[in-house]
């Protein structure tokens, strides 16, 4: 199943969204242009071809499996509900969110469970989290956006938005790859230093991380990318053909992510 969107079109969800494809036949959300900008670059590989998917405040649940969302202005925008730990669960599995001119995922006071998925290449941040409760397991979060040198990090975490406090109750990243072209692809900003009154809770376990190494008990058995590694950043992956805007995120056999 392929859903085609015109340049200013978007999907807004205020009830629930259930989209379940298969490995052989994923559900695809993309722009409607079938022509080429250049002989080796179809418009489908150019970001900003449509808007994206908005998960509204009244949404009661998202269940997406084997979905491919690509080449929009944003991927998934979660408006969120109240700043509590009881927000409706939004589940995404075995899916790709790729090549957005803005953020790949932007979540406000939401409850996300994302597993075995790829969130890559964004003109903004691949993932922007403002408060809420989140778990990412077996995910590749890669920032190799080709259309701007000013793109954001792969991952941005905060417990405030435009001066408004948004408690970050949980942000767990387990067996994930978080990398990109820059020297630091994980940025966190917290207001307040009291965990009870201003929660800013995160955990990284058994991940490959492109960020300066820190001593922190909430970073557990991770591999830190450094210049000592023969294979790092984009070389972790096979299938990158930038002139044709093709980005395959299958792991290279020499990647430091193998075995973590």
What are these regions (language model features)?
Residues 1-260:
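Beta-strand/loop edge motif enriched in small/polar residues
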């Amino acid at each position: 199943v392929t859903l085609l969107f015109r340049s200013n079109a978007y999907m807004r969800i205020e009830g629930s969204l259930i989209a379940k494809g298969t490995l052989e036949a994923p559900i695809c959300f993309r722009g409607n242009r079938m022509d080429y900008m250049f002989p080796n670059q179809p418009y489908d590989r150019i970001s900003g071809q449509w808007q994206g998917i908005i998960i509204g405040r009244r949404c009661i649940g998202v269940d997406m499996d084997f979905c491919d969302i690509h080449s929009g202005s944003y991927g998934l925008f979660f408006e969120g509900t109240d700043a509590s730990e009881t927000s409706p669960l939004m589940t995404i599995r075995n899916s790709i969110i790729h090549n957005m001119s803005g953020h790949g995922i932007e979540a406000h006071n939401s409850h996300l469970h994302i597993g075995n998925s790829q969130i890559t290449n964004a003109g903004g941040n691949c993932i922007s989290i403002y408060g809420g409760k989140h778990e990412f397991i077996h995910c590749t979060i890669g920032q190799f956006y080709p259309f701007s040198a000013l793109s954001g990090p792969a991952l941005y975490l905060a417990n405030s938005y435009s001066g408004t406090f948004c408690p970050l109750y949980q942000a767990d990243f387990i067996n994930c790859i978080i990398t990109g072209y820059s020297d630091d692809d994980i940025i966190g900003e917290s207001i307040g230093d009291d965990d009870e009154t201003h929660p800013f809770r995160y955990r990284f376990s058994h991940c490959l991380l492109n960020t300066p190494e820190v001593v922190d008990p909430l970073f557990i058995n991770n591999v830190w990318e450094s210049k000592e590694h023969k294979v790092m950043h984009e070389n972790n992956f096979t299938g990158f053909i930038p002139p044709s805007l093709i980005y395959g995120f299958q792991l290279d056999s020499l990647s430091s992510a193998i075995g973590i």
